[in-house]
Amino acid sequence: MQDNWPTRLAITCLLVAIERLGMYIPVGLISNPQANWLNGGGWFVLGIIPTINASIVMQILISIVPALTRLQKEEGEMGQKQIQKYTRYLTFFLAGIQAFTLSQQWCTWLLIVSGAMLVMWLAEQMTHKGIGNGTSIFVCSNIAANFLHHPIEAPWSLAMVVLIFTMLGMIALQEAVRAIPILSAKQLIQSIAQVYLLPMRLNQGGVMPIIFASSTLALLHTWSIWWLYVACIIFFSHFYNLVIANPKELSENLNKMAVVIPSIRPGAETQQYLNRTLNRMSWIGGIALSLIALLPWLFSSLKIFSGFGATSLLIVIGVSIDTMRQIRTYFIANAYEKMI
């Protein structure tokens, strides 16, 4: 974090306030103001959903199109900017399609699309200048605002039990790490007995697999099919793990640093070992995340939170955990800077 803590907090609050205000600015005739499951209409009726959908499509394209894969991995910062540019174009395209389903009037359509693009820009600014991931924060703020309009119908004791168990499950999953022992050339030469570990998070994507799965089901209008929801979570969890922790890149980086995994040969064998490890972790993490996602659904008949679904609860908890982790990292880094 380049800026100080109060500045980033102020920027985050300001951007969230702007995004929420845009939800209530009327834009004319909208055929279906309830089309977005995260807000209730207005200029920003599409919210962050087009950006999320564009990110999903772009990540899939990067994994299957060699030219985009090279652009992301080999072109460095310029490649990332180009990928971001393509994502913006795709966001505009998807926002245009969704806006047309809401209104066929040219002026209203243009306002809705411009609102979606502005929300995307606000999310980017929050990611770079505020606290946490802008997309996740906007999703969380919209859900929290919706929650304030719906009372808790079940007894507080039952609501707290479900909330606590869900929160504990998310925390355990977010903090779970597989530590792989590694040896450096310096250790071998100097006979250093200290053990170094390569930590790999069980759930690399955090709450993003749930957000992506929810967005996909909302787009397909298939909320009632619970097994499809589980399948989407497992798929996106597996996909995110392989994107964030690429076995080939990890193997090459370890080789460049003259670091090896005990009993595993450098190169292809190390890559295969990391690939097997990540695949197992992806399945375990995806299934665990799905089970946690289904936990509040077991109590759906009790209507603990009227108008506040299980997915919403998980997203709020997950985003809160991710944001707190980033804040903690900032304070630790700041303390180290003062020591130096």
Curated annotation (Swiss-Prot):
<protein>
    <recommendedName>
        <fullName>Protein translocase subunit SecY</fullName>
    </recommendedName>
</protein>
<dbReference type="GO" id="GO:0065002">
    <property type="term" value="P:intracellular protein transmembrane transport"/>
</dbReference>
<dbReference type="InterPro" id="IPR026593">
    <property type="entry name" value="SecY"/>
</dbReference>
<keyword id="KW-0934">Plastid</keyword>
<dbReference type="InterPro" id="IPR030659">
    <property type="entry name" value="SecY_CS"/>
</dbReference>
<dbReference type="GO" id="GO:0006605">
    <property type="term" value="P:protein targeting"/>
</dbReference>
<comment type="function">
    <text>The central subunit of the protein translocation channel SecYE. Consists of two halves. These two domains form a lateral gate at the front which open onto the bilayer between TMs 2 and 7, and are clamped together by SecE at the back. The channel is closed by both a pore ring composed of hydrophobic SecY resides and a short helix (helix 2A) on the extracellular side of the membrane which forms a plug.</text>
</comment>
<keyword id="KW-0653">Protein transport</keyword>
<keyword id="KW-0793">Thylakoid</keyword>
<feature type="transmembrane region" description="Helical">
    <location>
        <begin position="42"/>
        <end position="62"/>
    </location>
</feature>
<dbReference type="Pfam" id="PF00344">
    <property type="entry name" value="SecY"/>
</dbReference>
<keyword id="KW-0811">Translocation</keyword>
<keyword id="KW-0150">Chloroplast</keyword>
<feature type="transmembrane region" description="Helical">
    <location>
        <begin position="282"/>
        <end position="302"/>
    </location>
</feature>
<feature type="transmembrane region" description="Helical">
    <location>
        <begin position="304"/>
        <end position="324"/>
    </location>
</feature>
<keyword id="KW-0813">Transport</keyword>
<feature type="transmembrane region" description="Helical">
    <location>
        <begin position="204"/>
        <end position="224"/>
    </location>
</feature>
<comment type="subunit">
    <text>Component of the plastid Sec protein translocase complex, which is composed of at least SecY and SecE.</text>
</comment>
<comment type="similarity">
    <text>Belongs to the SecY/SEC61-alpha family.</text>
</comment>
<keyword id="KW-0812">Transmembrane</keyword>
<feature type="transmembrane region" description="Helical">
    <location>
        <begin position="106"/>
        <end position="126"/>
    </location>
</feature>
<feature type="transmembrane region" description="Helical">
    <location>
        <begin position="152"/>
        <end position="172"/>
    </location>
</feature>
<feature type="transmembrane region" description="Helical">
    <location>
        <begin position="225"/>
        <end position="245"/>
    </location>
</feature>
<keyword id="KW-1133">Transmembrane helix</keyword>
<dbReference type="GO" id="GO:0009535">
    <property type="term" value="C:chloroplast thylakoid membrane"/>
</dbReference>
<keyword id="KW-0472">Membrane</keyword>
<dbReference type="InterPro" id="IPR023201">
    <property type="entry name" value="SecY_dom_sf"/>
</dbReference>
<dbReference type="InterPro" id="IPR002208">
    <property type="entry name" value="SecY/SEC61-alpha"/>
</dbReference>
<feature type="transmembrane region" description="Helical">
    <location>
        <begin position="10"/>
        <end position="30"/>
    </location>
</feature>
